[in-house]
């Protein structure tokens, strides 16, 4: 209907992002189950390594560009930023709509790329020469490149919109230092997107012309260099991983201070500086993804130490969350369970990241399952736990309905066991030398792969249970009476759900 197709309302567009992200998340999860099914036993299950790598590549692209980013930035960002700023809507409401509607075509292009020729079995990094015209003939990689172009344009437009909204549409009394931490996290994320995505666009456009227009940007035969592609890709790729986690940081700050009964997060100014520092440092560490391509020892030393420095602002955030929790009598609501799980498991993922930052160690661990375990701890148990925490926390505000708390707690326990059982054994596999992106492995790795596959099955059951919980809530229509006690953030002063046009008059915020 016209309401959804041509919407200029930040709440409706945010809801569209949530639905799209949930749908894409189902596709991405299905692909991950295929990966674990293939690896659950030595020997072939699905086919050859090409089809396996097409599945791995699509799993990564869908989870990153069509699940985490649309939900965190498009869903939570659109819904909460205007409400937290006291703004009537986003700065550019129609551009907001276009940002969303670029995503379904982008996802379609990605899905089509796997259905023509042999698919794009390049890994999400799309390194040439594997992604170049000889090793990947046909249209698959070209379609994947166009998919990334559209998703990138969508994110850049969204970033411009968020930055403009935050600069121009803050309500009276909301100075930058008093702005909610979630809004800060989104605006820093938007800056990272704005600065990193054009570099990715340049890299994949050069790859496109190498494949189709006979250029040789990445072909040594014509004076090009495939390592140039790696530098360009990771100059985008590393900020991207901070783009995926920063909005989560913002949400966790709100949930922890709210559930602790505190009026603000411990050291909120320090939290802002920490996020700014993470955003800045994220741009100067990219070559730690390239320790095995033969860089000078002094270059490796720089990237090792610069990478470790990111642990400092990250540590500030972790300890400030713990300080916010300090001295509180917690009631273990589902939202705080996810937030506590986030703090613990994100820390585990961060510690394995510090291990990998050592270039000499990384030369051994690069392209093994240790790296897979590391980034799934910070994504599958960082970003996804933050999404779960945020969804449960703000669901009563968005819908005016309640979820079944007892079921939500059971669901948390199922997921917690599932994801840890899936990814913790992968540290052992990596230390034992099992390489990434292979569909088969020697018998010695069988035991931990079986454990990992069982864990992924438990996680799948947990996700299905969660969708049932949402269905039950929507069907039962239990209206919220009081959404929350002791509001620490102004979005809770809205009706539940908020009026279609909140803040028709400019609110004045005082101390």
Swiss-Prot record:
Binds 2 heme A groups non-covalently per subunit. Binds a copper B center. There is a cross-link at residues 238-242 (1'-histidyl-3'-tyrosine (His-Tyr)). Its EC number is 7.1.1.9. It is found in: Mitochondrion inner membrane. Pfam families: COX1. It is a multi-pass membrane protein. Component of the cytochrome c oxidase, the last enzyme in the mitochondrial electron transport chain which drives oxidative phosphorylation. The respiratory chain contains 3 multisubunit complexes succinate dehydrogenase (complex II, CII), ubiquinol-cytochrome c oxidoreductase (cytochrome b-c1 complex, complex III, CIII) and cytochrome c oxidase (complex IV, CIV), that cooperate to transfer electrons derived from NADH and succinate to molecular oxygen, creating an electrochemical gradient over the inner membrane that drives transmembrane transport and the ATP synthase. This is Cytochrome c oxidase subunit 1. Fe(II)-heme a binds at residues 59, 376. Keywords: Calcium, Copper, Electron transport, Heme, Iron, Magnesium, Membrane, Metal-binding, Mitochondrion, Mitochondrion inner membrane, Respiratory chain, Translocase, Transmembrane, Transmembrane helix, Transport. GO terms for biological process: aerobic respiration; mitochondrial electron transport, cytochrome c to oxygen; respiratory electron transport chain. Its cofactor is heme; Cu cation.
């Amino acid at each position: 209907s016209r309401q959804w197709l041509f919407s200029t309302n930040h709440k409706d567009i945010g809801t569209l992002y949530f639905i799209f992200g949930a749908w894409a998340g189902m596709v991405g999860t299905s692909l991950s189950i295929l990966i674990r099914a293939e690896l659950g036993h030595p020997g072939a299950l699905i086919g050859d390594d090409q089809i396996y790598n097409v599945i791995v590549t699509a799993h990564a692209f869908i989870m990153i560009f069509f699940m985490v980013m649309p939900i965190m930035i498009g869903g939570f960002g659109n819904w909460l930023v205007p409400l937290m700023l006291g703004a009537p809507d986003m700065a550019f409401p129609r551009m907001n709509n276009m940002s969303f509607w670029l995503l379904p075509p982008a996802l379609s292009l990605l899905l089509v790329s796997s259905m023509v020729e042999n698919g794009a079995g390049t890994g999400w990094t799309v390194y040439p020469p594997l992604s170049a015209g000889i090793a990947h003939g046909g249209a698959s990689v070209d379609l994947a490149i166009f998919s990334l172009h559209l998703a990138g344009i969508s994110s850049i437009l969204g970033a411009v919109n968020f930055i403009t909204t935050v600069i121009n549409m803050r309500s009276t009394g909301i100075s930058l230092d008093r702005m909610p931490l979630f809004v800060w996290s989104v605006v820093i994320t938007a800056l990272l997107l704005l600065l990193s995505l054009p570099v990715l666009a340049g890299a994949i456009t050069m790859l496109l012309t190498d494949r189709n227009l006979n250029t040789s940007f990445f072909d040594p035969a014509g004076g090009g260099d495939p390592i140039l592609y790696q530098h360009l890709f990771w100059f985008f790729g590393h900020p991207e991983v901070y783009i995926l986690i920063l909005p989560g940081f913002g949400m966790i700050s709100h949930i922890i201070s709210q559930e602790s009964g505190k009026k603000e997060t411990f050291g909120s100014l320090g939290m802002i500086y920490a996020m700014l520092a993470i955003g800045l440092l994220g741009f100067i560490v990219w070559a730690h993804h390239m320790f095995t391509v033969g860089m000078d020892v002094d270059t490796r030393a720089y990237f090792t130490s610069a990478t470790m420095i990111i642990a400092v602002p990250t540590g500030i955030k972790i300890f400030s969350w713990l300080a916010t929790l300090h001295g509180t009598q917690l009631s273990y609501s589902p939202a705080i369970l996810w937030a506590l799980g986030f703090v613990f498991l994100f820390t585990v993922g961060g510690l394995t990241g510090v291990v990998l930052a050592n270039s000499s160690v990384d030369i051994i661990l690069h392209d093994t399952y240790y790296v897979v375990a590391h980034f799934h701890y910070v994504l599958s148990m960082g970003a996804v736990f933050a999404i779960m925490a945020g969804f449960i926390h703000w669901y009563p505000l968005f819908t005016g309905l309640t979820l079944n708390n007892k079921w939500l707690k059971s669901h948390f326990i199922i997921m917690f066991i599932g994801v840890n059982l899936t990814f913790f054994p992968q540290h052992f596999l990596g230390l034992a030398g099992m390489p990434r992106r292979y569909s088969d492995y020697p018998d010695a790795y069988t035991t931990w792969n079986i454990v990992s596959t069982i864990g992924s099955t438990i996680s799948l059951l947990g996700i299905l249970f969660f969708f049932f919980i949402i269905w039950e809530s929507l069907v039962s229509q239990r209206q919220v009476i009081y959404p929350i006690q002791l509001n620490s953030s102004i979005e809770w002063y809205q009706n539940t759900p908020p009026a279609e046009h909140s803040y028709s008059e400019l609110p004045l915020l005082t101390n």
